[in-house]
Each structure stands twice: as structure tokens, then as C-alpha cells.
């Protein structure tokens, strides 16, 4: 059981999760010409909040997560809501390759900083996107480690220019980025610190 299995049951109770997802989804809809013929993959979907916001703009979304408890939460939400164009996939894309499927759009938010080999996962995204399709990544700008605190083994955000270069290296074009949200996070009893979130968009030529 990983840390996200433990957090799954209370994940949707955090209003920041919803506010952040809505800000990111709205910016995606503004910048990418989504349509009802497009299939999408949300990588590291969590409880699927972003996909639920984007579902009416796309033909179908596959909600992928390697946390079985998060997937159970999504399955339950899909069942209760009666939504027909969302489906879940309990899969670890870091460790395995997804075979015989392609998407027109891959997106993720606040996931990349948990990924060990960022260039490897971007390459996998490229291999999974149809020509003309899009990639959208929302995550933290480089920060001093305060966001997660001691013991975190992932990335303390990203240098946006270096990440853009990595995305370009894997074959994407039309790369653009902008700030899309600010998380005001309590990092101690007396200190609340702002952490800016970027959205980077790229296209598979």
C-alpha cells in the first residue's frame, strides 16, 4: 500500500484539490482545441477530479493511476454519477509499457514531481499520443523543498525551461507554458507559503 492508497478516502474532502483542478481544466480548455472525437488519458488521475471537469469536452477519458485505492474511489464516483465516457485503469506506466492503444490527448497535474525518470515518462507519453495530439502537464515551479517537507524523495518542482527542453528532446513541438494557479500551503503553525503551478502545453507533430 503506497501513500496515495492511504490518502484516497479523504482526497476529495480537500477544497484546494477541486479549486486547483478547475483552474487547470479551464486553462486546458482555453488553450487546446478539445472536441468530442478526441480520446484522452489522465496519467496519475488520483480520484479523477480533473477528468470529471473535462469529460464533456472529450469523447472518452481513461483515468490511469497506480494506486488501487484511488482507482476504487474513481470507479465508485463513475458508478454513482452514471458517466459513460470515463473508464479507469490501475496501471504503473513508470514500470510497464501500455500496448496497442493511442490517445489524442494526455494530461496530468501535480504528478510529474513524483516520477523518478521524467524524460523516460515524457518519451512514453510521446509514444502514446497520436500525431497532432496534445500533452498538458501542470506541476510546481522549482521550489526549496518546503512544499513536501523532509523525507520527500521526488522533485522539488521544475525549472520550466529545462522541462521544456526535455519535452522538446522527446519530439514534441509548439511548447508553451504559463502560470495557472497558486497553492497557498501551510508549512508550519505560523507560516503559509505560496507555491505557483505552471501549465505546459506541447503537441505531437
Model regions and ranges:
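Conserved class I S-adenosyl-L-methionine
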Residues: 1-35, 73, 80-81
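Class I SAM-dependent methyltransferase SAM/SAH-binding core
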Residues: 41-95
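A conserved beta-strand element that flanks and buttresses the S-adenosyl-L-methionine
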Residues: 107
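Short catalytic micro-motifs in class I SAM-dependent methyltransferases
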Residues: 110-114
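A short glycine-rich, Lys/Arg-flanked "PGG" loop and its adjoining helix->strand segment in the class I
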Residues: 119-134
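Acceptor-substrate binding/catalytic loop of class I
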Residues: 146-162
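Conserved S-adenosyl-L-methionine
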Residues: 172-183
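Core SAM-dependent methyltransferase catalytic element
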Residues: 183-205
